[in-house]
Amino acid sequence: MGKVYDWFEERLEIQAIADDISSKYVPPHVNIFYCLGGITFTSFVIQVASGFAMTFYYRPTVTEAFASVQYIMTEVNFGWLIRSVHRWSASMMVLMMILHIFRVYLTGGFKKPRELTWVTGVILSVLTVSFGVTGYSLPWDQVGYWAVKIVTGVPDAIPVIGSTVVELLRGSVSVGQSTLTRFYSLHTFVLPLLTAVFMLMHFLMIRKQGISGPL
C-alpha cells in the first residue's frame, strides 16, 4: 500500500495539498455561526444525492408525475425516507442560507475586498429559491399545479414583454406538459450545474481571501 501511495505522491504531491488544506489559519473570533455556510453546502450535497436517487423512479409527465411520486412513497424500498430527507434538507438549506446571509451582513463580511464573494453568495441565494419554486411543482398535485400557475403568471404584469416572459416560462400560453418539462430540466440539470459553479467560485474566493475579521 505504501508503494502505491508513494507512486501517487511522486506525481501529484498529495501531502503538499493536504498540508495546504489542513494548515489554513482560522481567526480566534470564529464561532459556531461561521458554520452556517458549511451546513448550507452539506444540505445541498444531500439534496443532490437524494434527488438523484428519485430520478430513477420519477416520471416528468402531467399524467404520470403524481402517480410516480406516490410509487416512490409507497412501493420503492426506503423511497419514503429518501423523499422525506430531500424535503427536510431543502427546508434546512433555505433556513441555513438565510441565517448565513444575516451572519455575513451583521459581521461585515461583504465589505472590501470581499465584494465578489458577497455577489456570488447573492446569486447562490437566488438559485436556492429557484430550486424551491421548480421542485414544488414536480409532484404535479393541486398545490404544485396552482403554485406554478401563479408564479409563472407574475411576469405578465411587466409592460411590453410580460406575456412573452410568461410564455417562455410555461412553454406555451397555458400551464401544461411543456411547463413541467421546463421545470424538471431546470430543477435537475440547469440549477444544480449553476449552483455547483458558483459554489466553487464562492469557496475559492473564501480560500484566497480568508475569513473576514471581527467588527
Swiss-Prot record:
Gene coding for it: petB
HAMAP family associated with the record: Cytb6_f_cytb6 (MF_00633)
GO biological process: photosynthesis; respiratory electron transport chain
Additional facts recorded: Heme 1 (or BH or b566) is high-potential and absorbs at about 566 nm, and heme 2 (or BL or b562) is low-potential and absorbs at about 562 nm.
PANTHER family in the cross-refs: CYTOCHROME B (PTHR19271:SF16)
Localisation: Plastid, Chloroplast thylakoid membrane
Cofactor(s) required, per the database record: heme b; heme c
Membrane-protein topology: Multi-pass membrane protein
Residues binding heme b 2, per UniProt: 86, 187
Keywords: Chloroplast, Electron transport, Heme, Iron, Membrane, Metal-binding, Photosynthesis, Plastid, Thylakoid, Transmembrane, Transmembrane helix, Transport
Assembly behavior: The 4 large subunits of the cytochrome b6-f complex are cytochrome b6, subunit IV (17 kDa polypeptide, PetD), cytochrome f and the Rieske protein, while the 4 small subunits are PetG, PetL, PetM and PetN. The complex functions as a dimer.
SUPFAM superfamilies, per database record: Transmembrane di-heme cytochromes
Binding positions for heme c per the UniProt entry: 35
InterPro entries: Cyt_b/b6_N, Cyt_B6_PetB, Cytb/b6-like_sf, Cytochrome_b_N_euk/bac, Di-haem_cyt_TM
GO MF assignments: electron transporter, transferring electrons within cytochrome b6/f complex of photosystem II activity; metal ion binding; oxidoreductase activity
Transmembrane parts of this sequence: 32-52, 90-110, 116-136, 186-206
A single Gene Ontology CC term: chloroplast thylakoid membrane
Lineage top rank: taxon: Eukaryota
Family to which the UniProt record says this protein belongs: Belongs to the cytochrome b family. PetB subfamily.
Function: Component of the cytochrome b6-f complex, which mediates electron transfer between photosystem II (PSII) and photosystem I (PSI), cyclic electron flow around PSI, and state transitions.
Principal location class: plastid
Protein's name according to its UniProt entry: Cytochrome b6
Organism (species): Chaetosphaeridium globosum
Binding annotation for heme b 1: 100, 202
Cofactor: record remark: Binds 2 heme b groups non-covalently with two histidine residues as axial ligands.
